[in-house]
Amino acid sequence: MGRTLNCAIGVHSVVSRARAEKGTRVVFVDPRMPEGALTGSKWLAIRPGTDGALLQAMLNIAINEKLANFDFLAKHTNAPYLVTADQKPVTEAMLREGGRANYFAVRDSVTGEIRFQGMKKNEAGEFAGFDEDPSTKADLYFAGSVEDAKGNALEVKTAFVVFAETCAPWTPEKAASVTAIPAGEIVQLTRDFFTQGGVVDDGWYGSRNGNDSEIFALICCLNVFTGSLDRNGGFVVTQGAGMKSVSASYAADKGQGKSPTGKTWKQEGGEKKALDKVLYPESSGTYSAIFDAIETGKPYPIRATFITGSTMFHREANSDRLAKALKALDLVVVQDILPHEVMDYADYVLPCTFFLEWHEYAGVKWHINGNVQVNDAGIDPPADCDAREEIWQFCEIIRRAWPERAAERLSYDKEIKTREEFKKWYYGMVDKAWNKFIAGLNEKKPGEGDRVAADVAKQGWSCVKKKAFDVFPYKKPFGTMTGKPEILSFLVATKYQDKGLHPVPQYFIPKEVYQQPKPNSDEFYLVSGKDSSSSSGVSMFNRPTEFLGDRSVWMNPIDGERLGIETGDMIELEALHSGVKGRAKVKLTNRVIAGSLFAYSFSGGVRTKTIKDSRYNWVREGINSHWFCTGYREPVVGGLSNNTSVRVKRV
């Protein structure tokens, strides 16, 4: 849903093999047809931001037609757990004097008794299994009253009942009216999904329409309803190899860090959270959270920023807001290898290195098995270019500002002036960590580390651990309050309901995200996405991208005919909320849903003044869709809206 599988290295080949060898069917749900849907796959064109309506309709069908795995829901999720009228969990402490606050109430469907379930911990506080009476037949469908610890009646329902009630209004017909996917297609898609071992990809990043966190939660719920969680062929947790790369770590909640050599240190007053975590506590990184602090100095002043290898103007929605923030800072330092637009705002540009110039051992991300790999420097930077690894630059800056901190926290106690010195220092730590990892494998199983080391030396990678299925949540817990998949989030119910999130994930579009375009008019959704060759911060400057890249704006022929616009025409796009304007050539194609425009991200609209070579003027062609965005951030999680709405005219 909303993802092209062609962009991530290896994913497309895995899908291609599955189709060829297993007959796997692939369905893409997207406002535009991605490259992966061009041959042998199905494309369901959906209105932007309405994925949640489709998902709730599919879940509603799965419940009504008994397609879901109800035994799995009763045993391995919080579906049978009781919740109050405000959807908060019913705990043992609420129903029994002296009861436990982390044990949750379920009703036995045979005896009618209320029983309590929770996670057992050993003396070290580690998970030791789920504390559940095996004879309990947890009731998914209970709704009624129970007696609390003070003898009062408490109205409750199971999380499943609340979930089903939330999905019930979403009939196939209602979802069709919202998504533009025919009702019959929705019904058939659901039946095929549940009867043919379906899995929904859990996405690449959720930054589209201001409702993405709940859409991804619904995607997870759909996978959970199949009952194939962490089972072969199902929605799984990847294995991990257990390889720890060289790094300096910092635990903000404890104000404590660890140097690359393992030495711990304490930061006085360091328990304070980063600003994005204050404003968006479940965020994994919301850069624009600092913008208000830059302007107002509250809750504390921010006067400088380092930007490391990030194409900020092609990543950060609302380009004008970003530019204003950068201009207001006293110091902007950019570490990069290419002339991205953010350099126009930099006081210092530090030329860094590229992965082809690095030496490192690491785990292989996003692979089902626990693999490790080596990256060996194939080249060095040119002799007349003082390019350095970002870590080298950071270490030297910290050494000059706080030499004692550099020594204590980074094990960097003197200036390193040459690349050979850096290799000896840093690569020495890299190799030491690798040798320790190999020795640890040999200690657990004689010869195993030697096998892995030989594999890596010969082919560049090795499988350390094959995926162990049936682990989560059967033997190990998830990081939820119950340790199980939660179809009604107890974290949201207890902490974030008043912040704009829903305990039961559901479809909605925030009013603030962007103005909804009028249908059959000159107003459109503007959506963006990547292709498989040119949409990245590096390849957008490659000479082949001049010919392989597409810097046009796609429009459906139905819309083109209505507006008198043809392929090759120049159009002006104007943001509905701000009036920001940009121009690009049009391509009429049935690969985008009517009422929406599509433009490749990380592709065109580079406005930098640093490029002097006229051979690269083509990078300025087209638009950057972030020019037109509101920059709306989801509450609590801080996800940005990359999609927006515009008005169009031919010029």
Write out the residue ranges for each language-model feature.
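Flexible glycine/proline-enriched surface loops and loop-helix/loop-strand junctions
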Residues: 1, 39-40, 155-156, 169-173, ...
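Short, well-ordered alpha-helix to beta-strand connector turns
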Residues: 40-41, 196-197, 302, 329, ...
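Long, contiguous, secondary-structure-rich segments that constitute the structural scaffold
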Residues: 378-379, 387-447, 538, 543-554, ...
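Long, well-ordered, tryptophan-enriched scaffold segments
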Residues: 21, 34-195
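Extended redox/cofactor-interaction regions of prokaryotic respiratory oxidoreductases
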Residues: 1-28, 53, 131, 136-147, ...
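Short coil/turn segments at secondary-structure boundaries
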Residues: 70-76, 178, 188, 201-206, ...
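Glycine/threonine-rich phosphate-binding loop and adjacent beta-strand/alpha-helix elements that clamp
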Residues: 356-382, 393, 398-403
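A glycine-rich phosphate-binding loop feature that marks nucleotide/adenosyl-phosphate handling sites
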Residues: 75-78, 192-193, 235-246, 410-430
